[in-house]
Amino acid sequence: MKYRTHKCNELSLDHVGEHVRLSGWVHRYRNHGGVVFIDLRDCFGITQIVCRQEENPELHQLMDQVRSEWVLCVEGLVCARLEGMENPNLVTGSIEVEVSSLEVLSRAQNLPFSISDEHINVNEELRLTYRYLDMRRGDILDRLMCRHKVMLACRQYLDEQGFTEVVTPILGKSTPEGARDYLVPSRIYPGNFYALPQSPQLFKQILMVGGLDRYFQIATCFRDEDLRADRQPEFTQIDMEMSFGGPEDLFPVVEELVARLFAVKGIELKAPFLRMTYQEAKDSYGTDKPDLRFGLRLKNCCEYARKFTFSIFLDQLAYGGTVKGFCVPGGADMSRKQLDIYTDFVKRYGAMGLVWIKKQDGGVSSNVAKFASEDVFQEMFEAFEAKDQDILLLIAAPEAVANQALDHLRRLIARERQLYDSTQYNFVWITDFPLFAKEEGELCPEHHPFTAPLDEDISLLDSDPFAVRSSSYDLVLNGYEIASGSQRIHNPDLQNKIFALLKLSQESVKEKFGFFIDALSFGTPPHLGIALGLDRIMMVLTGAETIREVIAFPKTQKAGDLMMSAPSEILPIQLKELGLKL
């Protein structure tokens, strides 16, 4: 049986007089007495079909029994709609199909939520439980089809650039990469476990050792970590690695790749992208993921804070803290109530409070007005280039606290005051990250232990490791990190040195990374790589609020699959086969 001659988005006035066959779901049903109208929907669009009782009473009776989301196959004649009855919201809105025969292919139960009315707000848990119904509402399928086109564009471009797609193993060895591993018990080796990959990091580096010049993979990765709006326990990344190159070779390739991906949605990007060091980003925006669609740039105010008699300023400076903030153009219209709300907001991030200074009619209004002279305030206005009716918002706190609080505050204010265009795409490369971070007073990798230090900082590894910068880079878009990578260590002695600084014993290194150190010891080319978060890119590209909206079958924020009721208990016999007990 041939189910269709056309899709539900294809018919137009050019087809009037043709006999056609369509298949799809009942999107909407309307019985106007002697006339039944059905909007028939498939993946591609909607076509109105119609049956008149006076012309075909038996068929009219059958169509009158049809309900929402039944699957139909219909035959009929394409006719022009009556003048004034056209639907400009449909590509098929100038025609309708007068049905001559109808077959019910599948019936549907009563729906848990409306599919035809996309504007009805449906609880997300209910949507995820019935994900297959949620897909029919339109947005999800549109995003999945866009994702498909993005992956096609990715593969085509990287092939043009000489990259080879290689699939790396899913079952691997548990190695410390930052997050917790998902572990898979081995039946054949009782008491031993595979780990699902947090990334193909070691495999792709070993591919470079093996002589592959350029590698890529659209890889599924797994991390057992606490979830946020832009995180999932399993996610997809565009993984890349290349030999005999540095950042200056990689950046143009990635910029053109991103441009090709955005071109799928008709968005034109300009390259090269802006570059900024990690320290510049922290100093000016309080974060290594700055949103550059708007200003509100941070400025250090310590030299002016010392001229105050305000104890909170002076105490923070005495204990090595900072005073910094930003200027909000036209922000002098903020009420006391609004400023109190902002004060409570920054306290969530550890700040003690918020200092505000308004420039109004050439004078000063401030909650710290009595702690400094008029001249000091005027100096601050000049430093911030503040104009009349602007406001300065300042925080006195340890550097990390001040940065975090101000980062969140500037984003909040920019959103509330509509200081940016939501259709604007501002990319920036963040470079020269610290090689190490501090965790409970100990060294830990800022990215991962395979990142190469900058050549000029290698001499500091023993004397001042926290001052060592790395040859690493993130690509940030509108405040989201969408890619991260680095130059890799290709010298086994330097790699062992990094492991030693991280206080990994030789036994531990041999157990977890012995195979990798062995590989580096057989002649390894200089190499570097990057991974682009496909889910995050799709989230930004399609305007989705979370990455759950761009994944076919996502997990909840508690890492559960509501549709399949996973994770689930397993049978005692399965545990026994694995040599496990609960």
Swiss-Prot record:
Location(s), subcellular: Cytoplasm
Site (Important for tRNA non-discrimination): 32, 84
Gene3D superfamilies tied to this protein: Bira Bifunctional Protein, Domain 2, GAD-like domain, Nucleic acid-binding proteins
Keywords tagged on the record: Aminoacyl-tRNA synthetase, ATP-binding, Cytoplasm, Ligase, Nucleotide-binding, Protein biosynthesis
InterPro entries assigned: Aa-tRNA-synt_II, aa-tRNA-synth_II, aa-tRNA-synth_II/BPL/LPL, Asp-tRNA-ligase_1, Asp-tRNA-ligase_1_N, Asp/Asn-tRNA-synth_IIb, AspRS_core, GAD-like_sf
Residues noted as binding L-aspartate in the record, renumbered to the chain: 177, 223, 447, 488
Positions that bind ATP: 223-225, 232, 481, 533-536
UniProt EC number: 6.1.1.23
Pfam families attached to this UniProt entry: GAD, tRNA-synt_2, tRNA_anti-codon
Region (Aspartate): 201-204
Any one GO cellular component localisation term in the record: cytoplasm
GO-annotated molecular function: aspartate-tRNA ligase activity; aspartate-tRNA(Asn) ligase activity; ATP binding; nucleic acid binding
Function: Aspartyl-tRNA synthetase with relaxed tRNA specificity since it is able to aspartylate not only its cognate tRNA(Asp) but also tRNA(Asn). Reaction proceeds in two steps: L-aspartate is first activated by ATP to form Asp-AMP and then transferred to the acceptor end of tRNA(Asp/Asn).
HAMAP family with a match to the protein in the record: Asp_tRNA_synth_type1
Subunit structure: Homodimer.
NCBIfam families membership: aspS_bact (TIGR00459), PRK00476.1 (NF001750)
Membership in a protein family: Belongs to the class-II aminoacyl-tRNA synthetase family. Type 1 subfamily.
Name of the featured protein: Aspartate--tRNA(Asp/Asn) ligase
